[in-house]
């Protein structure tokens, strides 16, 4: 019996892939790189972010040298545009069904709690989740150098004493699918987000 559904946020519940690509291209331009297409983004995007930028052909030294510029430009453009994003098609219906079924729902994300909560309120779905597992404040960037949200989820699961077969991990990237497979959770892959469909197979 499923007791917990853990949703990724960006690209999974929030339809922000186009906004993210626009922000990424602004950051690339700021450090003298060429813009990328949606398909290039979906093929390259990964966590930690250093791996993503390496997939785009950048060296670690280049990334570290320009990290602050990349982060500042990306977040500046993203936050200016994110209020135009809606939930993914069908998301609200699924969330309401799970709530009516008394299944615990959490968001586990590489984003930060204040900005996620602000969007949840704007989208009128803030009362549906039991917890947001993410960076505690804007500006934290643990995901730049390592995967960390799986540890937040695993700690929550241990606290609640859920068993692996009682958990579903839902996401639009390899990260959420790999987390599920590693720890024995069921997985649901959402296409049309940050990764290509073939990467989610």
Each PLM stretch: what is its role?
Residues 2-93, 97:
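N-terminal helical cap/lid subdomain that shapes the substrate entry/recognition surface
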Residues 91-121, 132-135:
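Substrate-recognition element of Asp-dependent hydrolases with the DxDx(T/V) motif
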Residues 192-201:
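Short, glycine/polar-rich helix-capping loops at beta-to-alpha or helix-loop-helix junctions
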Residues 15, 171-172:
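Acidic di-acidic motifs
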Residues 99, 181, 201:
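Anion (oxyanion) recognition and catalysis
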């Amino acid at each position: 019996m499923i007791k917990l559904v853990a949703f990724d946020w960006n690209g999974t519940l929030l339809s922000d892939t186009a906004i993210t690509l626009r922000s990424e291209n602004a950051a690339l331009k700021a450090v003298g790189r060429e813009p990328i297409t949606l398909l290039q983004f979906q093929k390259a995007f990964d966590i930690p972010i250093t791996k993503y930028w390496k997939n785009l052909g950048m060296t670690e030294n280049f990334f570290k040298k320009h990290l602050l510029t990349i982060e500042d430009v990306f977040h500046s453009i993203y936050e200016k545009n994110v209020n135009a994003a809606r939930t993914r098609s069908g998301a609200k219906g699924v969330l309401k069904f799970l709530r009516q079924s008394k299944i615990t729902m959490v968001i586990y994300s590489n984003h930060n709690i204040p900005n996620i909560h602000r969007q949840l309120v704007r989208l009128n779905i803030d009362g549906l989740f039991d917890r947001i597992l993410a960076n505690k404040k804007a500006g934290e960037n643990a995901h730049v150098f390592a995967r960390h949200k799986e540890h937040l989820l695993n700690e929550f699961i241990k606290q609640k004493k859920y068993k692996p077969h009682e958990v579903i991990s839902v996401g639009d990237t390899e990260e959420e699918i790999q987390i599920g497979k590693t720890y024995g959770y069921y997985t649901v892959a959402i296409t049309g987000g940050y990764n290509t469909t073939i990467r989610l197979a």
